[in-house]
């Protein structure tokens, strides 16, 4: 790991002046900080993250409305409130550009005081956030949206595995004595693809127990019974997210579901285990609402809109991240390759029709020995994201 840090010039420490500037930021939220913010502290709010996550940068809030619809809030940490333009911390963040995630560590863009504390949406702590709030029907119709600065107090920190348990059990989970912490924590370390040594399994169990103890300080308590209202929120949001996802693919999104390979290393940085991280419905739930928020904000800025009845002018300049249409030559190569296995695929120039054709090919090849190779070629035919 040290050689990677050296090869790419990754700064694993912050200069004292940057650390001092971050440490000088107050942990307390004052009335001045709350001015102009919508208050969501009494609204049911939670995060869903990997079980070993240390920084929680987004959260969902959920509230049933009297008209039968739901208010769903997508909240992210309001980093810009703490990191002011031109400050020492701002200049350092610009120089770094991004956080870099290695197998055994993270090289953060911001000092720990910000990334893991002030701007981490930890449970039972008031946090300043920027939010996209939607009124949504049970059939995922967007009635209205609002964007602005808020304050939240997360009630619960879910691991993906725990949220997935609720989804898997469906309505039965409402009557079950599901408990946070233990199952979610251990699920991620009990599904190895490859064990590099006989001792790895025992080591994984020991480390999971250590993570479990550490998580007690982050709001995930061993044996903590998950309240019914939280389970209801997860199930309702899962239903809405499923409709949003189906609608997105019908509109031309392409489904790539390659499992991510994860490597576990020991204290000396040596690999001891390789396992698959498979994306499930709990991951899709978060993904769909993040996409909804991003897309809605982009549409609002691009076309102009109304917030609280006041028309906003469309921004003349804004940064969008988009994917161009697939490379036709590479698509032709994919068609030829797939044809060797008996598949036929049209290659229309229209982007949406091409997306439908690609999804059809991937669906037809699903669970076949050649699927992985076809999916890789399909992925390579995609254009890189541009700004």
At which residue positions do the language-model features occur?
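Electropositive polyanion-binding surfaces
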Residues: 2-387
């Amino acid at each position: 790991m040290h050689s990677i840090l050296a090869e790419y010039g990754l700064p694993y420490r912050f200069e004292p002046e940057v650390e001092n500037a971050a440490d000088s930021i107050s942990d307390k939220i004052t009335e001045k900080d709350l001015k102009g913010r919508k208050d969501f502290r009494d609204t049911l709010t939670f995060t869903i993250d990997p079980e070993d996550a240390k920084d929680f940068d987004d959260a969902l809030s959920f509230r049933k409305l009297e008209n039968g619809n739901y208010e769903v809030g997508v909240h992210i940490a309001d980093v810009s409130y703490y990191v002011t333009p031109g400050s020492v911390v701002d200049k350092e963040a610009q120089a770094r550009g991004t956080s870099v995630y290695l197998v055994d560590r993270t090289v953060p863009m911001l000092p720990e005081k910000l990334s893991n504390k002030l701007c981490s949406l930890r449970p039972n702590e008031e946090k300043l956030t920027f939010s996209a709030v939607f009124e949504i029907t049970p059939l995922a119709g967007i009635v209205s949206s609002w964007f602005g600065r808020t304050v939240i107090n997360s009630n619960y920190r879910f691991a993906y595995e725990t949220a997935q348990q609720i989804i898997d059990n469906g309505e039965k989970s409402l009557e079950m004595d599901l408990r946070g912490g233990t199952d979610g924590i251990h699920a991620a370390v009990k599904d190895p693809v490859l064990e590099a040594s006989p001792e790895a399994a025992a080591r994984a169990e020991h480390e999971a127990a250590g993570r479990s103890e550490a998580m007690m300080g982050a709001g995930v308590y061993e044996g903590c019974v998950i309240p019914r209202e939280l389970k209801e929120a997860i199930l309702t949001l899962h239903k809405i997210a499923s409709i949003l996802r189906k609608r997105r693919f019908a509109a031309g999104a392409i489904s790539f579901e390659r499992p991510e390979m994860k490597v576990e290393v020991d204290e000396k940085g040596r690999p001891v285990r390789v396992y698959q991280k498979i994306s499930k419905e709990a991951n899709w739930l978060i993904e769909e609402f993040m996409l909804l928020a991003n897309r809605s904000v982009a549409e609002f800025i691009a076309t102009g809109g109304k917030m609280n009845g006041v028309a906003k002018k469309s921004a003349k300049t804004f940064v969008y991240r988009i994917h161009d249409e697939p490379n036709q030559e590479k698509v032709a190569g994919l068609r030829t390759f797939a044809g060797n296995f008996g598949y036929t695929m049209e290659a229309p120039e229209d982007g949406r029709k091409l997306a439908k054709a690609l999804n059809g090919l991937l669906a037809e090849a699903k669970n076949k020995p050649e699927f992985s190779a076809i999916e890789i070629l399909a992925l390579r035919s995609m254009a890189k994201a541009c700004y």
